[in-house]
Amino acid sequence: MTPQCFLKTLKTAKQTYTFSIYKLLLNSSSINQTLASPETPLSDLNLSTLRRILSDPDIKSWKCISLFNFILENPSLFSFQPDLRTHLSLTFRVLSERRFSYAKELLKPVAIDDILRYPFNVIVSSVIDECGCEKKVVGRFFNSMIMVYSDNGKFSEVVEVFEYMKNNEVKIDEKTCTLHLLNLKRCDQMELARDFFSLMVESGIDVVTVYSLTVVVTVLCCNGEITRARELVEEMGLVKGVKANIVTFKSMIGCCVKRWDFEELDLVLKLMEKESVMLDLDSYKVLIDGFTSYGKVEEAERLVLMMHDKKLRVESYLYNLIMNGYSRFGLVEKVIELYSEMSSRGVTPNKDTYWVLMNGLCKAGKVCEAMSFLNELRVNEFEIDEEMYSTLSEECYRVGMIDKSLEVVAEMIRDGFIPGATICERLADSLFEVNRKEAQMLITIVVKCGIKPKSCSQYGLK
């Protein structure tokens, strides 16, 4: 602003509203504190004066907002209340400065407040009557209206605003539409989300993006409509030129895997290949988890090999999933083979890896091999938990390795775990038969667990 214009504006300000208020707003650093002081000339303020203040370019917009909020929060101090026109005037001012969060806060009372709210058609009429703003600011206003309605659950009003903007050629922001879809999804309004997306598509306006498509695909998948989601992805690619990305496909992959719908999964993966969308690290993890949980262990192993070929980081837990899958089928040789491959490819085994190995070997009756991995656990300084100890002691006993079972129980006790009463009683029975002194120790442990074993009466113990 030139010095001449500034002096002219200042002169006008002096003439149109009380100079004390004007000076207050120009110089004060804290509007609320100043207005609350007894010296403040609040009686000089009326609705007409307020409107001129709020539109004055010499007064910072943040000061206008503070003054406006002070009036709303302290109605008893004023003989008037800001009307719709005043709300809109300040809203358009902050929107012209791209202060969107302030604009939404200013719109809340007139859009959703139980007492102050106005119907949308009344707000539109006021905008038409009062607005002299440029087209892009008007667009910001209506997009802000959509978000205020959406954030506060007024979903039918969102459609009303959308229709108005479409019919009056007001630019609809694609981000606004996506955020509204996310709000609908968050509120579990799946049907409304589908309907709104259809409205976006049918409007003929370029507002459908990969982001809004992904939200709707996720909504459809949450409802179990995987086929519809896949068909929508194909349709949007052909009709709108909107290509799905890996995030879109991950929603469908995750849904197929959770439902063990491998027929549909195959179609989704083929569509990915057709669209030249590559699986990422997370997609591989989801697929491997799904295949192993269903029992498609070989497919899961094939995916791990693909990950290695593509130089993707393969974590030990992925090998653990596959090894555990083979273990469930009793294919302990495959478990050992995978463990060897894991080491050769530089993937460091963790505690769970050893647990899968030991558990699988025990189930196959290969207890000695399982015990060797227990020693490897100690060498690698992994913590041995109670379940590992219990399994090994029971399996050693089952195959007749009484001394080994006793050794595991003793180590278990040294590590602060209490052995199960059943294994202690079984070991005690076996040791009593050969008059081993360790039997008494085991019976004592059982009794301390609150169980009276048969061995007590059988061998004359009380």
UniProtKB/Swiss-Prot annotation:
Query: Could you provide one GO biological process annotation from this protein's UniProt record?
Result: mitochondrial mRNA 5'-end processing
Listed Pfam families? PPR, PPR_2
**PPR repeats, residue ranges:** 138-172, 173-207, 209-243, 245-279, 280-314, 315-349, 350-384, 385-419
Q: Which UniProt keywords are listed?
A: Repeat
Tell me which family the UniProt entry assigns to this protein: Belongs to the PPR family. P subfamily.
Could you tell me which species this protein originates from?
Arabidopsis thaliana (Mouse-ear cress)
Gene Ontology CC annotations of this record: mitochondrion
Q: What is the protein's given name? A: Pentatricopeptide repeat-containing protein At2g28050
Q: Which PROSITE patterns does UniProt cross-reference here? A: PPR
Record-linked InterPro entries: Pentatricopeptide_rpt (IPR002885), PPR-containing_protein (IPR050667), TPR-like_helical_dom_sf (IPR011990)
Q: Does the keyword Repressor apply?
A: no
